[in-house]
């Protein structure tokens, strides 16, 4: 079921991103970046498209994507790269925590598709990512900020530890993963996407954001658990995925109406996160019902795609709201990962937990 939809959707998004890539201005802080028609700017994380671009360059033999990926890398070096190894989130702000997302996709790009690059380019990229990995290893702020960062960095450090054969990364990965274990409630909900991360508010509440949990934190925790084979963490990941699946609507939308970061809520998830598909498909070997959630959400992404871009909801275009490119380049990474790992064949339809709930 659904065979081919991941590749078709990935090609559609990436073709539009190619169209929006800036060329020929002579300004290194512009050329290579991807212009957002909704925000009238170049988003600092647009070079997250490097991994899906290289995937398509490799799969389809399309030289355009290889050149676009290299241009994106150079754009990032001139614009958001910093001397300490970090990447800032945007030129208008100093936050460096999003370096973790850049490192994850760049390591995956080098691991699977680095052979497409010229030897000197490959070495330069590898050295640059190593510098970013060193920054992440020593960035202690992840221990006190929103929970998604300690979890995603545990995955980043794991990937870098394996790629660079560096035990210091592996040790840091394990430390952060152990910290993450403390952030799950008895019911399986992930807590800590807000302040206080490890405590209670004055009204004795805990910060929870369904969108970020399903599309960013749980996917990274699931990958960590399955990549390491840690049985305890695999069980925790499956319990959490099951608990959060109750917030998926029958049409594949996600209910994040009460989330601590619901200002980023979209009908299918959250604006700047990567998506829930890979996690649910990866864990579907343990619980086949998870593949149903992946299929429904994928269909919702397909339904919300118009003119080559992923819109935030099913009626946004007809209301005159333009689509932010962040939606497309972030979720393109997940589609590439699904195809990379051959998980598309697991997609299936069925009944979601929401449909089984009895109403009074």
Residue positions per predicted region:
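Well-ordered alpha-helical scaffold segments within catalytic/enzyme domains
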Residues: 1-2, 47-63, 101-120, 152-167, ...
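Terminal, non-catalytic domain-edge segments
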Residues: 1-27, 223-227, 231, 235-243, ...
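Low-complexity, Ser/Thr/Pro/Gly-enriched N-terminal "stalk/linker" regions
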Residues: 1-45, 55, 59, 63-74, ...
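Buried hydrophobic core positions in alpha-solenoid tandem helical repeats
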Residues: 17, 53, 69, 76, ...
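Solvent-exposed loop and edge beta-strand segments that line ligand/cofactor-binding
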Residues: 19-47, 83-100, 136-151, 187-216, ...
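Alpha-helical junction/boundary sensor with strong preference for TPR arrays
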Residues: 21, 60, 80, 113, ...
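Well-ordered mid-protein domain cores that form the structural environment of catalytic cofactors
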Residues: 78, 89-138
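Eukaryote-skewed repeat-based solenoidal scaffolds used as protein-protein interaction platforms
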Residues: 118-198, 204-205, 210, 214, ...
